[in-house]
Swiss-Prot record:
Protein task: Involved in histidine transport.
Gene Ontology cellular component annotations, sorted alphabetically: plasma membrane
Top-rank taxon, per record: Bacteria
Pfam families: SBP_bac_3
Record-given protein name: Probable histidine-binding protein
Keyword Membrane: yes
SUPFAM superfamilies assigned to the protein according to its UniProt record, in alphabetical order: Periplasmic binding protein-like II
Length: 268
């Protein structure tokens, strides 16, 4: 399939799959779990278009716009803080953050140590390679000399499952920009990461000559907003607000801003 059509179709499917996640809404703004509190949102702003830093060092992106819309709908206050990926969950569990929103996939393992909101985005893992490089199965991935992943991301988990956790062919990096730069410089044969992030990179950097493919070994994943284990009040606050944002149509507007189809038509 033509790459531009594939990107548009993939993003449209994400929107369709998640539009049914919300339930029946409520007319009044949901009360905050702790009225007057400013909820500290930890995020790794190296994951465009979900979060990145603007010219002034502020966190921006899909996750930020969505959380701001949720805060308005749910009548609570938030502040985002950029920090390294590997510090997000420790910050949550030791009380330095109240919420983690950073393209976090809901997994059974993570649910053992934290709670999640309802899903708000659907993705899969994809393989980013230079155009012309053949990748059609996991066997092709296994034949490569170096496969780049971000440490602790689900791309890391997926590749480790295929190749073995200690396989020297797996090159682990701190963030997505670093692994993509290494691929561009020829230090890697491929990168495995989240579909929406890789699609955004390919769309915005056509001169780099990159392409991406999906493999049947990679399953569908859902992003959720993480809170401390047992914090039911904050989970309810977030779910109620997310439901309102979906029902008002604001979710679709934010989605279209970052994941519009070719020609500017919003993905539905």
């Amino acid at each position: 399939m033509n790459m531009k059509k594939w990107i548009a179709a993939a993003l449209a499917c994400s929107a369709l799959a998640l539009s049914a996640c919300g339930g029946q809404g409520k007319d009044a703004a949901a009360p905050a779990a702790n009225p007057g509190k400013v909820y500290r949102v930890a995020s790794n702003a190296e994951f465009a278009p979900f979060e990145s830093l603007d010219s002034k060092g502020n966190v921006e992106g899909f996750d930020v716009d969505l959380m701001n819309a949720m805060a308005k709908a749910g009548n609570f206050k938030i502040e985002f803080k950029h920090q390294p990926w590997d510090s997000l969950f420790p910050a949550l569990n030791n009380g330095d953050a109240d919420i983690v929103m950073s393209g976090v996939t809901i997994t059974d393992d993570r649910k053992q140590s934290m709670d999640f909101s309802d899903p708000y985005f659907e993705i899969t893992q994809v393989v980013l390679v230079p155009k012309g490089k053949k990748v059609s199965s996991s066997d092709d991935l296994k034949k490569m000399n170096k496969v780049g992943v971000v440490t602790g991301h689900t791309g890391d988990f997926s590749v480790s499952k295929l190749l073995g956790n200690d396989n020297p062919k797996i090159a682990r990096f701190e963030n997505v920009p670093l692994i993509i730069k290494e691929l561009e410089n020829g230090g890697l044969d491929s990168v495995v990461s989240d579909s929406a992030v890789i699609a955004n990179y390919v769309k915005n950097n056509p001169a780099k000559g990159m392409d991406f493919v999906t493999l049947p070994d990679f399953t569908t994943e859902h992003y959720g907003i993480a809170v401390r284990k047992g914090d039911e009040a904050t989970v309810k606050m977030l779910n109620d607000a997310l439901e309102k944002v979906r029902e008002s149509g604001e979710y679709d507007k934010i989605y279209a801003k970052y994941f519009a189809k070719e020609g500017g038509q919003a993905a539905k």
